[in-house]
Amino acid sequence: MEKPLVSKKYLFTFILITSLFALWGFANDITNPMVAAFQTVMELSAAKASLIQFAFYGGYATMAIPAALFIRRYSYKSGILLGLALYAIGAFLFIPAAEWQEFSFFCVSLYILTFGLAFLETTANPFILSLGDKETSTRRLNLAQAFNPVGSLSGMAVASFIVLPQLLSDQRDAAGKIIFPLLSETEKASIRLHDLAVIRNPYVAIGLVVVAVLVIIALTKMPKTESEEKKAAGETHTVKETLSNLWHNSIYREGVFAQVCYVAAQIMVWTFIIQYADNLGINKATAQMFNIVAMSLNLSGRFIGTFVMRYVNTRRLLMLFGIGASVCTLGAICIEGMLGLYSLVAISLFMSIMFPSIYGIALENVDSKDTHLGAAFLVMAIVGGALMPPLQGMMIDQETIWGMPAVNMSFILPLVCFLVIIVYGYRSFMQLKSIK
């Protein structure tokens, strides 16, 4: 008899924790198109505008380990509540940031907001893994992660239909060129005030939603996980023992590196779709529609992938999806025009299962007493999203590389990342075969 993904006694908790995946998906994907928006309205280079992503994903790198130590000391529920509080504070800081019109203030606001996301991801991912049988843990996480693109699509929809169409700085002439740089300083100041207020509003709204979720979770009793029960019984590892165990687990160790590469690839692909489309003369609001299609493919891939995992080993499927992503990335690099853009969008289908699969594979054979810190390093791997986009932005600023549009050639960076994921899927699958 097939074991259920989630038993009835954990179902309400599973639903509640799964809602958090949508919350951080919203924050991720309303922020991606803001890179291009800030680049125009604040008159920044692509490299400097991508500091939005550096601040956003740098927050994960800064707070993942402190979050794990906090959860280790207290509980998963405490970590969730603190994460939601930090999320709300960062969102509400957009109010003074828009008033002062300081790009650095927006970066700080996002940095604090992602302190909260680091707590939520460090907590929610291993919590979902623990809510049922170990054999179904990776499939269970893939199912929960399928609701992350729901939040992402919501964020993209808000950006596409509410934020980007209202940006006066994106108005263009008959030739499709942005006219904002040609305006007087007085006109620019007026438009900047308007546009930053438009950018601010969805963050304030999501901050209010986060506060409501915080109250609901605060009033809900959560089940104790295996690691929390062992802690209560005095069965714990020291931090040094945990670090040693993790380091000597090759699949875990390589999984952290694969996750760094995956997040870097994901953020580069989704952030610079707009610049790729802009290079084809497409305005930001229309370009964002391609991001929505990409995320819809990603959402579909999560559900399809979760179903296929009943018949195909997760490790093998990860390798196959890595190959598919690499082929599409080559299309985005080598093919100019709309066909190249379609190839770029199609990458998202193959990225769909990567994050939860790498996460689940890496933690599958980690002792439950080590999962807090193990999860933290996998969340900390999101730093890949901070490090690589500025490098891609610098490539895009070159305009042409080897006679090709620089925006096309910049996708060599995510291609390298996908090759790493193919190798990880293959190596983890071969190790599983050797054990059997």
Pin down the residues of each PLM region.
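Multi-pass alpha-helical transporter architecture, strongest
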Residues: E2-K3, S7, L214-K221, L415-K436
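Extracytoplasmic
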Residues: F12-M42, A124-N125, V269-A277
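Extracytoplasmic gate region of multi-pass secondary transporters
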Residues: T31-V35, G155-Q166, S244-I292
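Central cavity-lining transmembrane alpha-helices of secondary-active solute carriers
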Residues: L51-I71, I292-G305
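C-terminal ends and interior cores of transmembrane alpha-helices
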Residues: A85-W100, I323-E336
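Hydrophobic core of transmembrane alpha-helices in multi-pass small-molecule transporters
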Residues: E102-L120, L339-M354
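Intracellular juxtamembrane helix-capping segments at the cytosolic ends
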Residues: F119-D133, S352-S368
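Glycine-rich segments within core transmembrane alpha-helices of 12-TM secondary carriers
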Residues: T136-L168, A376-P389
